[in-house]
């Protein structure tokens, strides 16, 4: 089979397709049509495998975009649905029942002791690490401000909206989201010595990777307790605003990806870590007045590192969404509070949803739903 392009340029044609309802070609919908597909020895009627995607990174993955404005009550996402001609906002408002999400994360001044979480029990830091899968809906983003309802959402929403049509109700897709605002690969990106993505550390007070692998394993255990066999089809990443311009970004990212695959190889397709996809996205390259971390040289170096990983010649399963304003990308915008982009670094409401749709379309186009 012809290899898929590693660097994904999703422009206006993609958006037109998505706004009409993203989907894989009907003739290519079977799991044996893709380069990464695997044959199962389990008869279809006895097959209890379910697809799992682990979402991680920093605040734009954690979900720092308003679906409803907490100050003036503007229904930003609902308005976008109407403007785009989509008449099913209630799906994302009430929950998509065949794509289930659990989430955990924090913004570094609060640390792991005060993480926002899907867990109904927030009495202790350990209790906050308890997974709680729910139909994917608005309000699964960061909320450390006591807002009720939670006004934020992340890429999980667009992913679920895009893939749900291709998911059996009795074999839901599970999204495990574990992401941390402001996080980078070295302690310097987190104030006051708070944790970073250094996977050599093994303490929740120091290592975000420790929290990621702990929360992921707990979530997989829950899926197994529900009678399913979880298969991690992809590691979905959005990070780089913290760490832009660091000369070792590519090395650090490769190590984190390799460590994650090694940690969860048992749950990979055919228990082969090389069959676990990696879905990344470039960081913002537009003209909004963001800091030096992701502008000019820092921004370019970080995106170049992402493209290098996505274009590995011996790997069919590394992908990078081109969200850039240049080079024919999606042109996603950030930082306009009136349009839903909380403070300086975060996607506006339409673009945060489009980002999720782009991840979802990658999943469909590359046959990652077995």
Regions found by a protein language model. Give the residues of each.
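Bacterial signal peptide processing site
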Residues: 23-25
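N-terminal, intrinsically disordered, polar/charged segments of Gram-positive cell-envelope systems
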Residues: 28-44
């Amino acid at each position: 089979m012809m290899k898929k392009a590693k660097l994904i340029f999703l422009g206006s044609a993609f958006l037109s397709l998505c706004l009409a309802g993203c989907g894989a070609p009907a003739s290519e919908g079977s799991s044996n049509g893709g380069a990464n597909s695997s044959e199962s020895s389990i008869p279809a009627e006895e097959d209890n495998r379910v697809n799992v995607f682990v979402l991680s990174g920093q605040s734009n993955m954690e979900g720092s975009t308003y679906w409803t404005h907490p100050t003036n009550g503007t229904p930003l996402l609902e308005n976008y649905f109407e403007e785009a001609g989509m008449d099913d906002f209630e799906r994302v408002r009430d929950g998509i029942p065949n794509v289930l999400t659990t989430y955990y994360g924090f913004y570094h001044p609060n640390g792991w002791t005060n993480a926002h979480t899907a867990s109904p029990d927030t009495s202790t830091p350990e209790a906050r690490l308890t997974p709680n899968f729910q139909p994917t809906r608005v309000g699964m983003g960061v909320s450390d401000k006591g807002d009720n309802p939670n006004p934020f959402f992340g890429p999980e929403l667009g992913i679920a909206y895009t893939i749900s049509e291709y998911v059996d109700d009795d074999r839901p897709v599970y999204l495990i989201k574990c992401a941390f605002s402001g996080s980078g690969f070295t302690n310097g990106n987190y104030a006051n010595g708070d944790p970073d993505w250094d996977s050599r550390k093994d303490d929740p007070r120091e290592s975000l990777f420790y929290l990621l692998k702990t929360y992921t394993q707990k979530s997989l255990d829950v899926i197994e307790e529900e009678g399913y066999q979880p298969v991690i089809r992809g590691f979905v990443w959005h990070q780089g605003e913290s760490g832009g311009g660091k000369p070792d970004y590519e090395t650090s990212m490769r190590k984190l990806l390799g460590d994650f695959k090694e940690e969860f190889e048992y749950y990979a397709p055919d228990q082969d870590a090389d069959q676990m996809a990696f879905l990344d996205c470039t960081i913002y390259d537009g003209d909004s007045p963001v800091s030096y971390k992701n502008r000019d040289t820092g921004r370019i170096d970080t995106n170049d590192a992402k493209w290098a990983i996505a274009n590995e010649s011996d790997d069919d399963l590394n992908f990078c969404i081109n969200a850039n304003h240049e080079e024919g990308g999606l042109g996603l915008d950030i930082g306009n509070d009136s349009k839903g982009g909380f403070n300086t670094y975060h996607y506006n409401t339409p673009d945060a949803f489009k980002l999720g749709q782009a991840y979802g379309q990658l999943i469909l186009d590359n046959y990652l739903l077995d």
